[in-house]
Structure formats: C-alpha cells, structure tokens
C-alpha cells in the first residue's frame, strides 16, 4: 500500500509547485512573518478537505453541475484580477515602505478571509482536486484510495509549512524595497495571467453551455 502513498505524494507535489494565489500568499506572509504558520496550517487543512472530497466522491458533483463550475470560474477571475491589482498597486507605490506598512496593519481575521478567498475562489484548486485527483484516486479500491489521499495531503502539509518557514528565514533579504517591488510585480503579473487564462476557459465553457 505504501506505493499508493508515494504516488499520491508525487502527484500532490507536481500540482502544488507552480506559483499560484495560494503559494504567493503564503510566501508573502512568510516574508512578513505575519501569522505565516497559521496561514500555512489553514491552507493545508483546506487542501485536506478539498482532496478528500475530490478523491472520495465530490468530483461527480462538480462534473454534473456545469453552472456551478461556471460560477466558481468567474468568481475566481474577479478575485484574481483584484488580488493582482493590489500587488501591482503596492509595487508601483512611490513610497513602497509606507505601502508595505499599511499591509502589515491588516488584522488576523482579514488575513484569514483573504487566505480563504485565495483558496476557495481559485477554480484551479477544484480542477486539481476534484477532476485530476478525483479521476485518478476515485478508481482505486477503498484501502489504496486512503493511502493515495494520505500521500497527497502529506505533500500539501509539507509544502505549505516548508514554504512559510523558508520565506520567513529569507525575510531579511526579501524585505528590501527592491525585492518587495520585484515580488509584488511578479505576483501581480502571474495573478492576471491566471485570471485571463481562466476567463478564456470560462468563455469556452459558457459557449458550450449555450450551444
């Protein structure tokens, strides 16, 4: 059964490595050393719920509900555009230190709300957990399925805590005005690229619904 664990772990690592809203948010919180371990835990727990739902039957709900998928997609597009705009606005600020200080004033609950939005309004999360993992893990018998899910969930916990701790460790180098500007530009551009990609997929999906 251990082979199914490592299959799930490898697939989980492959899906979580690319820079996305979750990774960018965890990295930024780590650099700020602001609730970064709490955010890593909440991201990993969210993945635990989504991965379990996808592998143990939730994929059927999403695949049978095209309007739900469309709603999630366009909600994600709107959020990613807003999130990317915020990052670019901070990067282009004439007083980057003041802009960064304003971000640091955010309370715990606002940070948690942003993390939940970054996770649960990202359609790629549902495609990864419900469609990819659901189609692969859903075909397994119950015992191998549990090991497969455990491997994928382990990858998520290891990655988010590792990213948060590494970013916090590198914080002295990454907190400089130049580094912060580069990071915010990179995050903003990536968020907008993902949003435009999702918008294209959303248009194609809506076209299929009405034809």
Swiss-Prot record:
Pfam families: LysE (PF01810). InterPro entries: Arg_export_ArgO_enterobac (IPR023445), LeuE-type (IPR001123), Lys/arg_exporter (IPR004777). The chain crosses the membrane at residues 1-21, 37-57, 68-88, 111-131, 147-167, 179-199. Its main location: membrane. HAMAP family: ArgO. Belongs to the LysE/ArgO transporter (TC 2.A.75) family. This is Arginine exporter protein ArgO. It comes from Salmonella paratyphi A (strain AKU_12601). The gene is argO.
């Amino acid at each position: 059964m251990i082979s199914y664990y490592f299959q799930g772990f490898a697939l989980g690592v492959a899906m979580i490595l690319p820079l996305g809203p979750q990774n960018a948010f965890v990295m930024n919180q780590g650099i700020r050393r602001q609730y970064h371990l709490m955010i890593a835990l909440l991201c990993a727990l969210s993945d635990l719920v989504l991965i379990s739902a996808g592998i143990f039957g939730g994929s059927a709900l999403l695949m049978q509900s095209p309007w739900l998928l469309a709603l999630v997609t366009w909600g994600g597009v709107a959020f990613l555009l807003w999130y990317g705009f915020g990052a670019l606005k901070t990067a282009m600020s004439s007083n980057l230190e003041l802009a960064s200080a304003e971000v640091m004033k955010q309370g715990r609950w606002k940070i948690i709300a942003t993390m939940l939005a970054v996770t649960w309004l990202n359609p790629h999360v549902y495609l990864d957990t419900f469609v990819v993992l659901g189609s692969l893990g859903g075909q397994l018998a119950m015992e191998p399925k549990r090991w497969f899910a455990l491997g994928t969930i382990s990858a998520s916990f290891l990655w988010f805590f590792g990213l948060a701790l590494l970013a916090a460790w590198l914080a002295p180098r990454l907190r400089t005005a130049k580094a912060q500007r580069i990071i915010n530009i990179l995050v903003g551009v990536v968020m907008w690229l993902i949003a435009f990609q999702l918008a294209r997929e959303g248009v194609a999906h809506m076209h299929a619904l009405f034809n």
